[in-house]
Every structure is written in C-alpha cells, then in structure tokens.
Amino acid sequence: MFIIKSMLYRLMQMIVVLFVISTLTFILMKLSPGNPVDKILHLDVAQVSMEQINATKDKLGLNDSLLVQWWHWMNHLLHFNLGKSFESKEPVTQILFNYAPITLLISFSTLVLSLCISIPLGIIAAKRFHKLSDKVIRVISTLSISLPAFFIGIILLFIVTNLMNIDSVILSQFILPVITLSLGMCAYIIRLVRSNLLMLLQSNIVQASRLRGMNERYILIHDLLKPTILPIIPLLGISLGSLIGGTVVIENLFDIPGIGYLLMDSIKSRDYPVIQGCVLFIGFFVVIINTIADLLTLLLDPKQRLQLGNPKSKANTPLISESSDRHA
C-alpha cells in the first residue's frame, strides 16, 4: 500500500512540474522580442492593411488578456494542439513527430552503448583495484569527463572525413554522434560502478560467501551485481534526460535532422510555435524519464522502500539484500 502511495506522490510531482514547464514556456514566448503577427503576415516585406492585422490578432487571440491567452494555451496543450509553424504552416505536433524519432533513437542507442561499455569496465576497475587496468580506465574516464562533447565530435569528424576519407551517412549521422555522447556518459557510470563495487567487496556477506567456498564469479553475479547496478538507475534517468537537451549541439554539429537541429533552425527564423514545441518536448521528456527512473528504483530497491517507509531509519541499511543468506 505504501508503494502505491509513493508512486502516486511521484506522479503528482510530475504533473506539477509539467504544469510549471508549460506555464514558463508560455511566459518565455510572451517575453521574447518580435510580434507573431509581423512574422505571419511578413510585414517586413509586404504592405498589409490594419484590418488584416487586427483580424490576425483576433484569430490568434492576442487581443485577449494574458490570463485568457494562458488559459487557451493550456487548453490547446491538453489537446496536443501547439499551433502551426510560421514558416511551413504545418501543425507543430506533426513537425515534432517527424523530427523526434531520430533524436530518441540516438539517445536510447547512446544509453545502451554506455551501459554495455561502462558496467564491465567499472567491474574490471574495481576487481583490479590500483592495478594497471584500473589506472588506465580511471585516466580515460577523467579525460572523457573533461573534454566537451562537441570537441570530441569535431575530432571524430576530422579523423573519419579527412584522415580516413570515409563518406557515409549512417556513420556521420548515427554512429559518430552515439560514440560522442556515450564517452561522457560512460565515464560517470564507470566511476559509480567502481565505487559501489569496491564498497560492496568489503561487506560481511561477501566475506561470508568466500568463507563458504563460493568462487568470485558466483559472488559477483549473485551477491554483487544487483546492488551495484541499482544506484545506476537514477543516474540513467538524469543522463537520458540531459542527452535529449545535449543533442542540440551534437545534431547541429553532425547535421542530424532531430529535435535539437529543429530548435536551432526555429530560433534562427524566430518560428515561435516550433520553439515552444521543442522546449516542451525536451522538458516533458526529461521529467517523464526521471519519474520512471524514480519509480523503478522504488520498485527494485528494498533499501529505498525501507527508508521511505520509515523516515527515521538510518542510512546504514545493508547494501545487499539479506536474501543472499540463501547460500548458507
């Protein structure tokens, strides 16, 4: 029952945050320079009568008070109506549906590649503590965190296009961006896995399993893997959300037709409805992904449930579930 209450509480938090994001997006567009009517009627290059200007304002609801405009904005948002682009006259929702798949594909591919690389490397670094392999992995992780993603992308582009003379759309618009985004994400996961595993290797349950004659692989899989990976879930939620925002630079660097590319192009042309749609998409995605990560952590981690169920409980709750005593 408590888990259901906690899940409902997090869902309510998500709704409140989404409401705030929607309101801030509305305010941001109202404070932005320029007039939508000027953009729609092309007043900078065309002669338009005052009747046409007033008719356009009435159609857009610009003559209403800000409160009424906000109410209409929220009502349209609930019906997935984000208006039409000033440039192409297409519905913004349809434009987002056209550009979002490539951004989501790159983001989730980055997540999968990062997990496949970082978890094994983090385990190796912990198992070979202070040995050569551990030092090499830590140095590479530090470099990956220190270098900006766009700088790594420029280096990869130079190597592939100039030195190797490879001209491939899949390579330049999918493989290289995924590698570029994965390097920084891998570094954080490697360090988290390494630190968690080093702490768990000193636990009493692991020592007891060794005394019972269990081999290291068995201990790793049955006693250490789950408590090592569980703390990664919240980090993945934050990282995946930031990946969507981070693709703004990477998509423009690699000329990828995704949400980030669309956002920059809309800013240049001052296409406000599309800008609103892109900001809302990124904000909503970040909030939803982080909420899912929190719910997964709550469902899978007994320690989290115990601490939430008993706020006075101390942080010294065993990191490894006592179910490991089944080996006894």
From Swiss-Prot:
Transport is among the record's keywords: yes
Keyword Glycoprotein belongs to the record: no
NCBIfam families, alphabetized: Opp2B (NF045470)
Primary residence: membrane
Swiss-Prot/TrEMBL keywords: Cell membrane, Ion transport, Membrane, Nickel, Nickel transport, Transmembrane, Transmembrane helix, Transport
Cited Pfam families: BPD_transp_1 (PF00528), BPD_transp_1_N (PF19300)
Family from the record: Belongs to the binding-protein-dependent transport system permease family. OppBC subfamily.
Entry function: Part of the ABC transporter complex NikABCDE (Opp2) involved in nickel import. Probably responsible for the translocation of the substrate across the membrane.
Location of this chain's protein in the cell: Cell membrane
Known partners and oligomeric status: The complex is composed of two ATP-binding proteins (NikD and NikE), two transmembrane proteins (NikB and NikC) and a solute-binding protein (NikA).
Gene Ontology MF term list: nickel cation transmembrane transporter activity
ABC transmembrane type-1 domain sequence ranges: 100-297
Family matches, as SUPFAM superfamilies: MetI-like
Membrane topology, from the record: Multi-pass membrane protein
Protein name in UniProt: Nickel import system permease protein NikB
GO CC term, one of those recorded: plasma membrane
Top-rank lineage group of the source organism: Bacteria
Species whose genome carries this gene: Staphylococcus aureus (strain bovine RF122 / ET3-1)
Alphabetized InterPro entries for the sequence: BPD_transp_1_N, MetI-like, MetI-like_sf, Opp2B
Residue spans crossing the bilayer: 11-31, 104-124, 139-159, 170-190, 229-249, 279-299
